[in-house]
Amino acid sequence: MTLSFITRWRDELPETYTALSPTPLNNARLIWHNTELANTLSIPSSLFKNGAGVWGGENLLPGMSPLAQVYSGHQFGVWAGQLGDGRGILLGEQLLADGTTMDWHLKGAGLTPYSRMGDGRAVLRSTIRESLASEAMHYLGIPTTRALSIVTSDSPVYRETVESGAMLMRVAPSHLRFGHFEHFYYRREPEKVRQLADFAIRHYWSHLDDEEDKYRLWFTDVVARTASLIAQWQTVGFAHGVMNTDNMSLLGLTLDYGPFGFLDDYEPGFICNHSDHQGRYSFDNQPAVALWNLQRLAQTLSPFVAVDALNEALDSYQQVLLTHYGQRMRQKLGFMTEQKEDNALLNELFSLMARERSDYTRTFRMLSLTEQHSAASPLRDEFIDRAAFDDWFARYRVRLQQDEVTDSERQQLMQSVNPALVLRNWLAQRAIEAAEKGDMTELHRLHEALRNPFSDRDDDYVSRPPDWGKRLEVSCSS
């Protein structure tokens, strides 16, 4: 089957990019590819059998027209000016059978005009982390970019140490970022901001294109998508680590996996990025940061969208966030209905977990085994202050009995939203260290496991992290 690529971005937004081709690596070789995703995109298996090929930027497929995008942004709350694709190249937009499109974005593809002081490369460590994280999030049901392939090489890349140069093929319906809009707003080119908005609506919100107030409706949906995404992050204990405006997806996708981390111990102020000295992007601050980022996006639209309309959309953020978060947390607790005491029970559990530094994922997974008429709980042994747990658990069981469902029905619901497996940093690190020695077994094994996060397991993928695996320091270095 011949893949079809179109050039909407190149043709319709000529001032938002520089056309250029990838720069191949030395002795590049394909070490992993996503068979399930490749099948979904109707990619012939033969493309994965001819060396690095397109996956390593050594050749292009018919119809591809590679380019690096320019955008700007606020980083850690400070205007950073022009940024852009410093190491990535958008190879093309694949046209799928249903009429939708999928960007093919090659990360680590070499120098671009937007590389600033960088070398345009990515390292094996960071490409493995992003591939694992994006696929883990996908199978958790959270909107995200996807990973299609990883190529490693003999090219040295200099970071804190010398590492192997690598490339990641990332795919997404769009790489539109808040930062694209900021770039032209701060260049005082509002007509180009409007062109971006029209492009987004025409291709991704086409049902709004003929509406008189399409910009208000569109921005309201961007707010809702962002609020929903952040709510989902919070419910699974995911910390992004670098929520700069240039890393915010207009479509509400999880984008740009760098120093991310899933909670091990329940620590509301968890900071996964060791460069985040002020804790701006701490786990519990993510909802507020996302709203701040939306406010920056709204500012770029103010030359052609009424400020009252923008503020009305922004005002809807908190309610959308709380609605999505509340619904999912009730499911995680096994509540089939909404009762007035639900929030108090959840907050009391969180307080107990924070005091005891309980494992976030294991706590909710073990809670899924609760039988409403049994005072015994396997979760009890996870707590030191068992009297406090017993007090909470007794009230929790009373609450469960208000919903007229069987234990098996409730447990089935809870186990479908409380994962047994999340991508803990130590699991990724173990796969990385093996891969850096040439052994890809753990990389493939972990990828396969992450496809079934809600299935029970009896291996160390679902155990508490070892001492060396806690508080692993992760930076933006990639």
UniProtKB/Swiss-Prot annotation:
Its cofactor is Mg(2+); Mn(2+). It catalyses: L-seryl-[protein] + ATP = 3-O-(5'-adenylyl)-L-seryl-[protein] + diphosphate; L-threonyl-[protein] + ATP = 3-O-(5'-adenylyl)-L-threonyl-[protein] + diphosphate; L-tyrosyl-[protein] + ATP = O-(5'-adenylyl)-L-tyrosyl-[protein] + diphosphate; L-histidyl-[protein] + UTP = N(tele)-(5'-uridylyl)-L-histidyl-[protein] + diphosphate. Keywords: ATP-binding, Magnesium, Manganese, Metal-binding, Nucleotide-binding, Nucleotidyltransferase, Transferase. Transmembrane segments: none annotated. Mg(2+) binds at N247, D256. Its EC number is 2.7.7.-, 2.7.7.108. InterPro entries: adnlytase_SelO, SelO. The active site is at D246. Nucleotidyltransferase involved in the post-translational modification of proteins. It can catalyze the addition of adenosine monophosphate (AMP) or uridine monophosphate (UMP) to a protein, resulting in modifications known as AMPylation and UMPylation. NCBIfam families: adnlytase_SelO, PRK00029.1. Belongs to the SELO family. This is Protein nucleotidyltransferase YdiU.
